[in-house]
Amino acid sequence: MIHEILPVGWLQCNCSVIGDPETREAIVLDPGDEVEKIAEILKRHKLKVKAIVSTHAHIDHVGGLKKLHELTGAPVMLHADDLPLYQAMDVQAAWIGMQPPELTEIHQLLKEGEALHWGAFEAQVLHTPGHTPGSVSLYVPQNAGKVTLPAPQLFAGDTLFAGSIGRTDLWGGSFEGILRSIRGKLLGLPEETVVFPGHGPTTTIGRERESNPFLQTQ
């Protein structure tokens, strides 16, 4: 697996480029900004983007969708419950004092349990609301499609962080909802699952299950 993580924009959203070294097909997760740097990674690995996925519709995760779609022609994917947030980009931009990015059409609405395929790889869509109503995580099992990985992988967006969880004080957030998502859908994954959050360092499900302070009490 080709996997490069690029922190983009002034909020340093972790954009992931995940490619199949054999077929050169790839998906790009959360291209929030700095599309020219994402393009450099794609060019260096000679990757063709099959899908552009946003784990949720906050401005720091979707700011580069239009440019990357125009560059690659790949469809843009988002959960339907975050469409109101996506369509309120001018409001989001005003919150943090920046110009709103140009928007592109959402070409495919992500659904719970849906499988995304690129090359020999497969990822399962998990609807994990709480940070936003339409937040999703992508789970890549160890036997991911036609290949075997060293460990399962979880691309958690802003739902689960190393030692923390996503904030829930913004529009559509729910503290109870995010805990329900994490406990109900994420903590039951294999403990060796490597977690790639939307910001900050990687972690594992086992580490968060054992020591994340937000997950130690009911």
Where is each model-derived feature located?
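Short catalytic-loop micro-motif centered on adjacent basic/acidic residues
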Residues: 27-29, 51-53, 125-127
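Short Gly/Pro-enriched turn/cap motifs at secondary-structure boundaries
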Residues: 6-8, 105-107, 127-131
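Hydrophobic residues in well-ordered beta-strands that form the structural core
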Residues: 29, 76-78, 156, 197
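Metallo-beta-lactamase
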Residues: 91-95, 121-218
